[in-house]
UniProtKB/Swiss-Prot annotation:
The protein, known as: DNA replication complex GINS protein PSF2
Family: Belongs to the GINS2/PSF2 family.
Domain of life: Eukaryota
Pfam families hit by this protein: PSF2_N, Sld5
Organism: Arabidopsis thaliana
GO cellular component: nuclear chromosome
Length: 210
């Protein structure tokens, strides 16, 4: 897997998050006969024309590019379902609606490679983008309320949203542990540091001449 973009804050790039999402299973309808495919991640197929089967997203994209299958969009990508989710997201400022962990990346890959297989594609894309924007706004707003808390629980966040929150949480925990350090430890560290400085500043004993 690609290395982390910034090791200090453990932030992944959008390309890295999308790469990890490509292991999600999606349903396709093959238009060819093919024997079972064996991978480290599992066995997929065999593939029979017009018989739906589930494969990793990366494999589905590869088959689609070769004209070997069509996609069956996941149920959550329907206009009706996305409209309900968007309304619920707007109504609540403190909770997030349940969506696949990689919903943004899955939708983006389907828009790029299987737009002809998605009913009302432009409406679906608009709804997904609106949902993403509303959730990001809520997330940014709620981050300010986490100041001074020792524990935070956020349910139903996506991979992209976790990636955004991670740097904030790391910095908050670092500050929490720094300020929560017992005074005894601080005093001990201070004394040790002072003793070290005094030792370093002591005059050196002259060497005895032979």
């Amino acid at each position: 897997m690609a290395g982390q973009t910034d090791p200090h804050i453990s932030l992944f790039s959008p390309q890295e998050v999308e790469f990890m999402a490509e292991d999600e299973l999606v349903e396709i309808v093959p238009n060819m006969n093919m024997e079972q495919l064996n991978f480290i991640s599992g066995d997929f197929g065999r593939f029979i024309p017009q018989i739906p089967t589930k494969v990793p997203l990366w494999l589905a994209v590869a088959l689609k590019r070769r004209g070997k299958c069509t996609f069956r969009p996941p149920g959550w990508m329907s206009v009706d379902n996305l409209t309900q989710i968007l309304e619920a997201e707007r109504e609540s400022q403190s909770t997030f609606q349940a969506l696949p962990f990689s919903y943004v990346e899955i939708a983006r890959l389907l828009f790029d490679h299987a737009r002809d297989d998605i009913p009302d594609m432009y409406m679906v894309r608009s709804l997904v983008e609106d949902i993403r924007d509303v959730r990001l706004h809520k997330l940014e707003t709620n981050l300010g309320s986490f100041q001074g808390t020792s524990a935070v629980k956020i349910s139903n966040v996506s991979a992209m949203e976790v990636n955004i929150v991670r740097p904030f949480v790391i910095r908050a925990l670092e500050a929490f542990y720094k300020h929560d350090k017992p005074e005894a430890d601080v005093d001990r560290d201070t004394r040790s540091s002072r003793q070290q400085r005094e030792t370093n500043n002591e005059p050196r004993r002259p060497l005895r001449q032979r």
